[in-house]
Amino acid sequence: MNKYIQEVRRRSQTLLIVEGNHEKNDLFWLIFKCFPELNIDMENVWIYGTNIYQFYDDIEKEYGENWDEEDVDIDLPYVVSRKKTPDNLRYKNDFTNIILVFDYERHDTFFSKSKIAMMQKRFSDMTDMGKLYINYPMIESYQHLKTIPDADYKDRKIPVLLQPGKRYKELVRKESVIQPHVYFPHKLDDLLDKHFQITDLGIRQACCEDILNFSDRQHMDERLDQVLQNIPEDPRKKTLKFQLKHWIDRANYANEGKTYWQYMRDLFVKIIYYNVCKASNIQKGVYLIKSEQYRESFESLDPGIILDKQNKLSNTDAGYIWVLNTSVFIVAEYNFSLVEKFGITATGDDLQRQGRNSCEGDGRCEDALA
């Protein structure tokens, strides 16, 4: 292959450095499936495996204690690959965009306001050294909507003393209207694998993909019969068909004439809107954003101001943290038109009206897969 062509191909890549498995294998796997326009290779989603405060220390070890000075050029792909894959070093020149996604983790023993503030300040441009997206209090905050629409999201916060992190995860598990939908593909695979012993990976994946692409509830029986033809004969096949039909009905996507991916894409657009509104409220005291102001409001968000306010509000044991997910902003950052395609712009009365059709009233979202 021509060396120049190979270099162009490598430079067109986007690198995503995340904290843990959930970010890569649940959230961003799903986002990339729902928004293929992002064109990010899952191989370029690197799991760092520890928190932002350890990341700060690793950068300091590599570049010295004055690494935060403006003239120090930080090569994050090198820092991470040197630690995780020393036999396969990578450099920032290999990538066009570098994105970091980490949790706020106020509860962590090594929490440091100065360290996280410096990380937010230094990593503000994905086309240069990288851009940091902080989730408050943790990555699971993107799931922390109780209904769609959720009028209370504006004021959703957690006490500083809600520690350790697994307590927040448990709270989200109990309250989230989003979580059952996020895990639906994984639960579907587990059902076929562990409960019905469909161990052939190719057959199982084909079945899951077909089911996730259903969009017509009226012909559900015929479609399921076609899918199950590929499964070896088993006396439990009839039971499996009825269980799948129930799950698909509760997941609600086919009821709306959408595939699972279309349904989740629309749901993510709503999640993004709610979090843009929340970030705007934290920063400027303005929550409900009208359609004509949506892009401007998003582009005026300042992660440094938001972090500073979160630090001040959570400074004592009596304090609190606003629930906010900024990692979903990656979609809007890539191409804002992707979040404008739902309804008008998924804002105001339009969001309220369309939201009621999917996740409120009949309990489908709350009880999906129950």
Features from the language model and the residues they span:
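Short acidic, Gly/Ser-rich segments with clustered Asp/Glu that frequently serve as metal-coordination loops
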Residues: G20-K24
